[in-house]
Amino acid sequence: MEAPCSPPTAGKFVVVGGGIAGVTCAEQLAINFPSEDILLITASPVIKAVTNFKQVSKVLEEFDVEEQPSTMLENRFPNIKVIESGVKQLKSKEHCVLTEDGNQHIYKKLCLCAGAKPKLICEGNPYVLGIRDTDSAQEFQKQLTKAKRIMIIGNGGIALELVYEIEGCEVIWVIKDKAIGNTFFDAGAAEFLTSKLIDEKPEAKIAQKRTRYTTEGRKKETQARASAGNVGSALGPDWHEGLDLKGTKEFSHKIHIETMCEVKKIYLQEEFRISEKKSLTFPRDHHDQSVTTDKEIWPVYVELTNEKIYGCDFIVSATGVTPNTEPFLCGNNFDVGEDGGLKVDDHMHTSLPDIYAAGDICTAAWHPSPVWQQMRLWTQARQMGWYAAKCMAAASVGESIDMDFSFELFAHVTKFFNYKVVLLGKYNAQGLGSNHELLLRCTKGQEYIKAVLQNGRMMGAVLIGETDLEETFENLILNQMNLSAYGEDLLDPNIDIEDYFD
């Protein structure tokens, strides 16, 4: 027999998730409805707040993500009440959320922002570490201090940043694509960045972008939750700031990339000994193809689909994320996308009445602008959380609103290998078929510029380095001006194209 529940709490608006999408949504609702209690349900004692927000251009934005105790959010917005508990069940027909602490929370409008969890290449293996939230990033730092060699599996943003930031440790990087950073770059941009990996890294300027709060009193509880598979909110931009990512050896970069392969099998030390297979030493030279058997004994061994086997201290699984829908699906008839996310329409509404979703948990199921696509990035989490709050507010007072302008054009600014990286529109010619052309300009070690054109109109761009072209290119994509007359002059470094299009 279940323990009797406490009397239900009621909030006109309830938000689930303490990550960027959830906190942004709750803050916006609190501003719109200062006399209403906004309930924010989160499994973590800390929340992720957007700070130093800067609108760089019409759609490009920059911000930091700061981890804060939830009390700071409640102090800023007295009408936000944070409930620190995981969700046990959603009863959509009763408009009720049951939390793991045994309480019930009644809502009129609900927004699900529970994020995503890392796809692990192997569940339950102590030598496989997924990096998704601050707890797992700090666990990674701890493991790295004892490591001589690690293997990184994956080719997304976290893998790219890790490979560049790690020092004093051999890194074997396994990617299933031909070139690095396939989510973000074509082979040309990948080549431009790869050269940076070979160079010695300059001493980084110590620029602490945000405060990290440790919650000592909760450490055991947090570890218990983490091992139970609980999900922390996603890492924000510059997540590795403040982490000392150094291994045991005295050198900067030692990276070997194994392309076009995946993990075939993982062996623990004893299993590998019994198998009588041979592992390889760390390749010393990209041009030297000679194979040497590794005499060193490692805690874990990885066999790749290209038949190579390497030993290492531990494996980092950075192979993407899965929307964290599990607590909400049972007993509720949500429409779910192919990627496992809750489908939302152009007002962030799910298929169930009064339930919205934003951030990594959702799948954009509307007909998108020709130069926008969903990617599970922190910029989109902020935009979706903000817009979902606007939609919930409008619906609750019977108003209709237009879709937010941020969904007109995909725009993301980040840093990889210490270069500023701006991605605009269909930057990798996604979905354009063969009917497109590329204009390229590259100055080794300085900048890489790619414009994607279709029928003379710019559809996307990649800008690496301090190019100062983001606003001009953003305008050219948005206004769809025919650029055929300019030809390759568009990227001529001797022509100031900003003067053309002011």
Curated annotation (Swiss-Prot):
Keywords: Acetylation, Cytoplasm, FAD, Flavoprotein, NADP, Nucleus, Oxidoreductase. It comes from the Eukaryota. This is Pyridine nucleotide-disulfide oxidoreductase domain-containing protein 1. Residues 208-231 are annotated as: Disordered. InterPro entries: FAD-bd_OxRdtase, FAD/NAD-bd_sf, FAD/NAD-binding_dom, FAD/NAD-linked_Rdtase_dimer_sf, NAD(P)-bd_dom_sf, Rubredoxin_C. Coiled coil: none annotated. Probable FAD-dependent oxidoreductase; involved in the cellular oxidative stress response. Required for normal sarcomere structure and muscle fiber integrity. Its main location: nucleus. Residues 213-223 have a biased composition (Basic and acidic residues). The modification N-acetylmethionine is found at residue 1. The gene is PYROXD1. It comes from Bos taurus.
